[in-house]
Amino acid sequence: MCGIMGYHCFGNVRPDKEKITDMFTLLETRGRDASGFAFIRDNNLIVHKAPVKSSELTKSPDWKNLTLPKIMIMHTRMKTQGTEKNNHNNHPLFSKNGTAIVHNGIVYNDKEIFGKKQRDAEVDSESILHLLSIKARGDKIKRLFDRIEGSFAVAAIDKSQPDKLFLIKKDNPIDLYYNSSDDILYFCSEREIMQEAMNIKQITKKGFNLGENDFHFYEMENNHSLIINKDGVESYQKYSPRLTDWWEKRYYSPGKNDETLIECPWCFCQTRYFEGKLTNRCTECGMEISEEDLLNVWG
């Protein structure tokens, strides 16, 4: 489990830096092994990341001296493969041609996607960066859905399109808040983190629900991409994911104490499962998962 967050400013107003700092710090509950952020300024992609939790990164000069840009993507990492001591493994991942991504999820077939091509990192997320940054005709996001086996909540920026934010969702959460007074769109892996950091509360009067002040909540639908430009929503498109036989190929392993990746029968997110362990809990929803639960779903 990792965390992604960020924002897109449509006008000249920038977010309250203290609130963005609070949100970034709260996001470390989803990953404390590394953290980072990326943005585009003067047609240059700028990435700051380190093998520290976000509450420590926000104390660094890179963050303290930063004037918030128009668009930013951010990440907190819980490592599943690839040491955090190799900063290439930490997010945001970025390519030589100026694409940067943050990813929450699991890719099972990254070796298939890369083949014999040389890799810069040791993490499965690199396959998503590869598919989004290669120069080829056609819809790059469709290519992602066509080829990736796994789950992903992705935010991406590209220096060739500096006014755009790309959000892509398959099985992992992306929640959105639009602040109409400041004309800023925020996104995060968890709605509650945004609510707490920005002090967003439900307002009622005489029994009428008046919403959440100037904040308007949206939840991205599964298997969709959202492209935001300087004027608003450029596209919101549904895709068909690649069909796989994960249960037979991925969810069983030979050893009783081996760790396997399963789909939680309660929230349908990917989580770790130890066949020989007495108690397993989903890292996303916290529900206990038993062998009987899995048989009821997949049997």
What name fits each language-model region?
Residues 1-299:
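Conserved short alpha-helical segments that host acidic/polar catalytic motifs at enzyme active sites
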